[in-house]
Regions:
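Extracytoplasmic/periplasmic substrate-binding proteins
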Residues: 60-62, 232-243, 270-423
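Conserved small-residue motifs centered on glycine
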Residues: 370-492
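Helix-loop-helix "hinge/cap" segment bordering the ligand-binding cleft or interdomain interface
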Residues: 137, 163-232, 246-286, 290-291, ...
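N-terminal secretory signal peptides that target proteins for export/translocation
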Residues: 1-5
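Extracytoplasmic/periplasmic ligand-capture domains
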Residues: 75-91, 105, 189-190, 255-279, ...
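Conserved N-terminal structural module of periplasmic/extracytoplasmic solute-binding proteins
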Residues: 6-10, 14, 26-183, 187-203, ...
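Carboxylate/His-rich catalytic cores and anion/metal-binding grooves
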Residues: 122-153, 160, 207-211, 222-248, ...
Length: 546
């Protein structure tokens, strides 16, 4: 990531709460933030030194720490934190994508860390319901001047971090939002075939068919295809049809017609032969990504694309050009797919902590501007230097990749908005191949996708959806998997299993497992919380600078 200077259907809950949905849990801390520029302080400068606390703090392990740097819990940056922070911290490694299992093991063995850093809202809600968390109001007031300033500047953080008992249990960060998932199309292929960027569903099918049948790469082989229904490609079709719960007449409702339209279009793409016939085996979309970057796929739905996306494509397709495109407008409206969550709760304190004061002091130190800048940018004149505006600018990219690239979760709770406003505007590093061209593509993407007139298709960001009660969560999970199976069956079965048959079976399944209870619960939640809930419309108040 570059440095910044100038920066309802029946499938309703399938999309919002399906296992495997990538949300910010997978998102990497952004190059953004700390409006609360309060230095870490120690009470009573003239008084005797306070006794140094000792705590445990969880830290995601993504398996990306270079051997030369040590381990994720013992490296130059964890040592720096212990040398400069107010407490002795024992970092506890938690596998990023198996965090719940690891935390459960730690709780069961009585080894839960004092400070728990966890992106997943549902798991933090579970810990709250099990009374495993400490309320933080008094601790923040007494020991966290930096976070107190954050709450004054962004009072919505307190509201989001407060649980039903009226007490604040979670600390979080502000990350100016930008597009997370966007659709990219091979414009050199469009030019060769004299086709425009598709604006309607029929045009999308026409372009996908041409990319599949008319040899757009000119190699004389039938080895390209137009679209992938794998992973995010499937969600993009749902988004195109607004296929989720939505607000109508100030109520949260679903619409079977939206689901049927989405399923029908997926089936149409498959029947026309314009998608990978084996897309169901591409569970995480890696094959689709590989096919796009190797020049075999014409339209790709990308998650957090960056300059490497373009550089990799150009490595095997030197003349390739790409552009962002919106999914076409349908009778249900026009929507985008995913945005980064601008208000992200990240951190809680274990109710069994032996030194909650030390835990809070350490957390406040970790989110201080001086701290996050050190962790994010590294050492001055080694990893960065100030530019002409006095903003930190990366140097030695290869060294940074080795010595800094693995440490992003150390500042996952920090609002990394520079107190010097001009330093939050992105600057292009011209030393990086394709950086200038990618910057233009990125700005085009943001112009298309960061528009409240073409909103996210979901009610809100996944992390701001309420957590279902355990019984309804099981019902919803069962519905998610079984409904997906039925939809996949009709998509690939030709005339032997029609969309109408699938819709009838989905209706029966919904009644059988009691999914209506889940939808009713969400509708009631919306009715009770619509005035205070953080919804899609609110995201556009927190857009990143361009």
């Amino acid at each position: 990531m570059g440095d910044y200077r100038k920066k309802s259907t029946l499938l309703a809950v399938v999309t919002l709460l399906a296992a495997g949905t990538v949300a910010a849990g997978c998102s990497k801390p952004q190059e953004k933030s700390s409006g609360a520029a309060v230095s870490p302080t120690k009470a009573g400068a003239s008084a005797a030194p306070e006794k140094r606390g000792k705590i445990k703090m969880s830290l995601y392990d993504r398996g990306n720490t270079p051997a030369a740097e040590g381990s994720i819990t013992n490296n130059r940056w964890t040592k720096w934190i212990n040398e400069n922070g107010p407490a002795d911290v024992e970092f506890v490694a938690v596998p990023r994508f198996e965090s719940k299992q690891k935390f459960n093991t730690l709780f069961a063995s009585g080894e839960a860390p004092d400070v728990i850093n966890e992106f997943e809202t549902g798991y933090r809600d579970q810990l709250y319901s099990q009374k495993q968390l400490l309320p933080l109001d008094d601790l923040v007031k007494q020991y966290a001047p930096n976070y107190t300033a954050m709450l004054e500047k962004y009072p919505i953080l307190r509201k989001i971090g407060t649980k039903p008992d009226g007490k604040m249990y979670e600390m979080g960060r502000v990350i100016p939002s930008s597009v997370q998932v966007a659709v990219f199309i091979r414009t050199d292929w469009l030019k060769k075939l004299s086709l425009p960027i598709p604006q309607t569903p029929d045009e999308l099918l026409k372009v996908a068919k041409a990319f599949t049948e008319q040899d757009p790469d000119g190699n004389g082989k039938k080895d390209t295809y137009g679209y992938s229904l794998a992973y995010l490609g499937d969600e993009a079709i749902d988004a195109m049809h607004g296929n989720t719960m939505f607000i109508k007449d100030d109520k949260l409702v679903e619409d079977e017609a939206r689901m049927k339209a989405a399923v029908s279009f997926k089936k149409r793409l498959f029947d026309e032969g314009v998608v990978d016939r084996d897309y169901l085996t591409d569970k995480n979309g890696e094959k689709a990504k590989k096919d796009f970057l190797s020049g075999k796929l014409g339209i790709y739905v990308a998650d957090n694309a960056n300059v490497d996306f373009l550089t990799t494509l150009r490595s095997t397709n030197k003349e390739a050009t790409i552009a962002p495109m919106l999914m076409p407008k349908t009778e249900f409206g026009q929507y985008t797919i995913r945005m980064l969550n601008p208000l992200q709760m990240t951190t809680v304190v274990y109710a069994g902590s032996k030194d909650p004061a030390a835990a809070m002091k350490e957390m406040d130190f970790m989110l201080a501007e001086k701290t996050w800048k050190t962790l994010k940018f590294g050492t001055e004149n080694v990893h960065w230097k100030n530019d002409e505006l006095g903003c930190p600018r990366a140097i030695n990219p290869d060294l940074r990749k080795i010595e800094i690239g693995y440490n992003t979760d150390l500042y996952m709770s920090a609002t990394t908005i520079d107190s010097k406003e001009i330093c939050n505007i992105p600057v292009v590093n011209k030393e990086i191949p394709n950086a200038e061209e990618w910057s233009k593509i990125k700005n085009e993407t943001r112009d298309l996708y960061e528009n409240p007139a073409v909103p996210l298709y979901t009610l809100t960001h996944l992390e701001h959806m309420p957590t279902l009660p355990a019984d309804l969560l099981k019902i919803n999970n069962d519905w998610t998997q079984q409904s997906k199976d039925l939809i996949a069956k009709t998509v690939v079965s030709g005339g032997s299993y029609t969309v109408d048959q699938a819709m009838n079976d989905l209706k029966s399944l919904k009644q059988k497992i009691g999914q209506n209870q889940t939808l009713d619960w969400y509708a009631k939640w919306y009715e009770q919380n619509k005035k205070n809930a953080f919804l899609t419309k609110d995201i556009y108040q927190f857009l990143a600078k361009k």
